[in-house]
Regions:
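Short acidic-glycine loop/turn motifs at beta-strand connectors
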Residues: 20-22, 94-95
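A general structural signal for well-ordered alpha-helical segments in protein cores
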Residues: 43-47, 74
Length: 117
C-alpha cells in the first residue's frame, strides 16, 4: 500500500492497514495536495475506508514508512484513531525496525464524545 502513496511534494510514502474486529483489513495511503492542508494521511485514509464499508470497531493499525526509526502517527491521526477506542494497537514499521503502542499512550488526554455538552 505504501507504494501507492501520492506524495510529489514531501516524497514521504506511508501505507496503512487497519484490522477491524471481524478480521477485515482496510487499506490507506497518504495522498498529498498542492494545497497542503488538504493532504490526507494513510492512517486516516484507512479509517475512512473502513467506516465507509460499515466497520466501527478496530483491533490494530500497522503503518509502513521509510523512516528509521519508524515514528508514530501525527496528532490528527491519533485523534481520529482514538475516536474508535483507547485500546487500539498501533504498530509503525520501517525498513529494519518496528515500534508498538496503544493509542491511549500516544494520546492520553484525547478529546472524546464525553466532553461534548
Amino acid at each position: 500500500m505504501q507504494a501507492r502513496a501520492y506524495c510529489p511534494y514531501s516524497k514521504y510514502r506511508v501505507g496503512a492497514a487497519l484490522e477491524a474486529e471481524d478480521g477485515s483489513i482496510y487499506l490507506g495511503c497518504n495522498v498529498e495536495n498542492a494545497s497542503y492542508g488538504l493532504t490526507i494521511c494513510a492512517e486516516r485514509a484507512a479509517v475512512f475506508a473502513a467506516v465507509s464499508a460499515g466497520a466501527r470497531k478496530f483491533r490494530r493499525i500497522v503503518i509502513a514508512t521509510d523512516s528509521e526509526p519508524p515514528g508514530p502517527p501525527c496528532g490528527g491521526c491519533r485523534q481520529v484513531l482514538a475516536e474508535f477506542g483507547s485500546e487500539l494497537e498501533v504498530e509503525s514499521v520501517g525498513p529494519s525496525q518496528s515500534k508498538r503502542w496503544r493509542i491511549r499512550d500516544l494520546l492520553p488526554d484525547a478529546f472524546g464524545k464525553e466532553l461534548l455538552a
